[in-house]
Every structure is written in structure tokens, then in C-alpha cells.
């Protein structure tokens, strides 16, 4: 199947399709694409995520300012989960061109669900909607960086088809970082 074939495009604020099997666990949680009007909420969720894992970084207000710009771009995707009017989770993805494919590569930068609502299928719904959206935008591959010691995250992504071994290879892929 070619990128985007059999998928649906979603506009910011559009409700994404229901996923069978999670209705009982998720209750009234809905998943939708974020737009610029959601910058405050996404900024606060990202700050909450950073605080939960003792990560220093921008304030919620600084994140909000950045999301005001990012959410208007076509190469940034944010999927939000909403529970009775309260945003309770999100995924942030960026897309970039590559000479290896006709479509784009996507990087799943962050995926977060508030602690009290974890293990209810919300993260799976968010990830599923993110994958559908990236495919609809012509994406052909999605990358995610996961800390080696974060076994829960590794198990989650592996359950959803991610691997740290490239097809046809027998060795793990590694991620390297240099602060600039």
C-alpha cells in the first residue's frame, strides 16, 4: 500500500475515528488533532510530563508560546486526548523529508497520558491516531527514542510494532546525541 492510501485526512479539531476494544476502558475520552487554539493545554501537558520525570526545561508559558507557532505548521502534528473537556494526554510528532523515500519520516517526540488515567488504552488510541495522521500526510516511517531503562515504554512501543532492530539486521539501532 502506498503512503496515504486507504487513510483519511484530519483537520485540527476534527474528532478522530473510534478504536474498537478500548471503549470500556476509556469511557468518554475522545482523541482529536490539536490546533493553535490548543497551545495552552499542550504547553501545560508537556510541562507536567517534564515535571513528572524531573526534567528541567521551559516553563508551561514558554512551551505555550512555542506551540502557538508549532501548531500552525504542516510538519508538526499534535494529537490530544480529552476526557469531559479536560485534555489528559497528547502525542507530539514532527515530519521531515528524506531522500530514501518519496514520503516523510516522522519523529514521535513525546507521548504522555496523565498518571491517573494510564493503563486504560488512551496512549494506544493517541498513538494509533498519530500513526493514521502521519500516514495521511504521506509519512512512511516513524521513529521514537526511548530510554533503555524505561521498560514500560519499550514494552508499549514494541506492542505497537516498533523495533530497535532494522529489518534484515540482527543488531540494535542506537541513538546518539550532541548538545549544540
Question: Where are the regions a protein language model picked out?
Answer:
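Conserved N-terminal entry element of GNAT/NAT acetyltransferase domains
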Residues: 6-37
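Conserved active-site alpha-helix within GNAT-family acetyltransferase domains
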Residues: 124, 148-166, 171-174
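Short glycine-rich hinge loops at helix-strand junctions in the catalytic core
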Residues: 121, 138, 161
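Acetyl-CoA-dependent GNAT
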Residues: 27-29, 33-103, 109, 114, ...
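N-terminal leader/targeting signatures
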Residues: 5-6, 45, 158
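Conserved GNAT acetyl-CoA-binding A-motif
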Residues: 134-146
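Active-site acidic-Proline motif in GNAT/NAT acetyltransferases
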Residues: 114-116, 120, 148-149
Amino acid at each position: 500500500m502506498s503512503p496515504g492510501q486507504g487513510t483519511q485526512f484530519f483537520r485540527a479539531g476534527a474528532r478522530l475515528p473510534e478504536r474498537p476494544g478500548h471503549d470500556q476502558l476509556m469511557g468518554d475520552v475522545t482523541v482529536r488533532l490539536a490546533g493553535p487554539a490548543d497551545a495552552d493545554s499542550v504547553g501545560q501537558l508537556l510541562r507536567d510530563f517534564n515535571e513528572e520525570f524531573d526534567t528541567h526545561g521551559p516553563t508551561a508559558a514558554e512551551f505555550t508560546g512555542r506551540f502557538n507557532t508549532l501548531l500552525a505548521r504542516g510538519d508538526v502534528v499534535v494529537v490530544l486526548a480529552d476526557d469531559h473537556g479536560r485534555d489528559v494526554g497528547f502525542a507530539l510528532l514532527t515530519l521531515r523529508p528524506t531522500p530514501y523515500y518519496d514520503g516523510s519520516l516522522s519523529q514521535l517526540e513525546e507521548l504522555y497520558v496523565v498518571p491517573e488515567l494510564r493503563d486504560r488504552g488512551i496512549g494506544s488510541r493517541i498513538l494509533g491516531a498519530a500513526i493514521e495522521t502521519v500516514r495521511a500526510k504521506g509519512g512512511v516511517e516513524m521513529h521514537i527514542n526511548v530510554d533503555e531503562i524505561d521498560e514500560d515504554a519499550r514494552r508499549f512501543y514494541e506492542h505497537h510494532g516498533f523495533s530497535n532492530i532494522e529489518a534484515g539486521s540482527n543488531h540494535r539501532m542506537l541513538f546518539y546525541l550532541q548538545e549544540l
